[in-house]
Amino acid sequence: MGTAGSLSLLKDQIKETLFVSNCDILIDQDYSEVLKYHRENKNEITVVAALKHYPIPYGTIETGENGRLLELIEKPEISFKINTGIYILEPHLLNEIPENVVFHMTQLIKNVNKRNGLVGVFPVSEKSWKDIGDWDEYYQNIHCRSTV
């Protein structure tokens, strides 16, 4: 049913703001802060995003017209936000999820954004987000927690 399709089964049952999370995600974050951000900004959806930094192991080149060099940057680091798979939704959005079809959270977010609904992004640090769907990260988290 996709990452959001099964939520259509809750249409008449959920009356309050709800957290939704992919099953293989952990974040080290005070969830009450995320909820406070969501409510203060009157968002319909809040996406929890992790900040990521990746060093590029090569020099990069930016060019202009006719292939002219504009800038040469040696081994830059790029920074961006990624979707962690954790969301806060207002209950009326459950009515926007079609029944009995594959439907993803990303599509719901795009639909809300397209109609100018309020979609917020709550950033968390790179280290606070754990994707335990990745075996290396899963093992690292199990090992780390067993030594505490």
Predicted regions and their residues:
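Short phosphate-binding loop-to-helix
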Residues: 1-19
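Catalytic-core segments of class I nucleotidyltransferases/pyrophosphorylases
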Residues: 18-19, 26, 32-39, 52-55, ...
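Conserved catalytic core of nucleotide-sugar-dependent glycosyltransferases
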Residues: 59-69
